Amino acid sequence: MVSWIISRLVVLIFGTLYPAYYSYKAVKSKDIKEYVKWMMYWIIFALFTTAETFTDIFLCWFPFYYELKIAFVAWLLSPYTKGSSLLYRKFVHPTLSSKEKEIDDCLVQAKDRSYDALVHFGKRGLNVAATAAVMAASKGQGALSERLRSFSMQDLTTIRGDGAPAPSGPPPPGSGRASGKHGQPKMSRSASESASSSGTA
């Protein structure tokens, strides 16, 4: 059985790259017939890719599933079967022609709703961002003011500790007693000196 990798490579090379190159040649040569042919192929291949997304999930267990995918892409590309032109002319074009107005209305409504939703969520996002910015700024300002206040209090206490003047009030009680005690020996010494001088005289 063909594995998923081989199937993916075949679809990528022969279902995408090969038609892309020939689409380039059709645009370059301005061949209307080839241009229409490859446009029909790309429409069918887009539908195939969309369906493949779901069938790979739910039908990958089916026997010969990947072989059928390769055979389908080859059938689309074959100039003998002209599978893409057949599917487009028989099914896709009539369906799109009958449902074109409804599809256009749905696309317009989806576009308007998506624009309104984008504007709504954009406004909400801006409001949330503005609120977060204001809260962050207020918190930062509060922290800065607290730090400045703490710095100013530290500076004030430092100035008081370094340059504080001496107290100008009366001396404490203990200082008078100390001076009196130290003054008594001086007085007794002067009295003894005067007595000795009078005795010698």
Curated annotation (Swiss-Prot):
Listed result of changing residue 19 to R: In SPG31; impairs normal ER-targeting
InterPro entries linked: TB2_DP1_HVA22
Topology of this chain in the membrane: Multi-pass membrane protein
Segments of skewed composition (Low complexity): 188-201
Entry's localization field: Membrane; Mitochondrion membrane; Endoplasmic reticulum
GO molecular function, one term: microtubule binding
Pfam families: TB2_DP1_HVA22
Functional note: Required for endoplasmic reticulum (ER) network formation, shaping and remodeling; it links ER tubules to the cytoskeleton. May also enhance the cell surface expression of odorant receptors. May play a role in long-term axonal maintenance.
Disease entry from the Swiss-Prot or TrEMBL record: Spastic paraplegia 31, autosomal dominant: A form of spastic paraplegia, a neurodegenerative disorder characterized by a slow, gradual, progressive weakness and spasticity of the lower limbs. Rate of progression and the severity of symptoms are quite variable. Initial symptoms may include difficulty with balance, weakness and stiffness in the legs, muscle spasms, and dragging the toes when walking. In some forms of the disorder, bladder symptoms (such as incontinence) may appear, or the weakness and stiffness may spread to other parts of the body.
Record-given protein name: Receptor expression-enhancing protein 1
Organism name: Homo sapiens (Human)
Organism placement in taxonomy: Eukaryota, Metazoa, Chordata, Craniata, Vertebrata
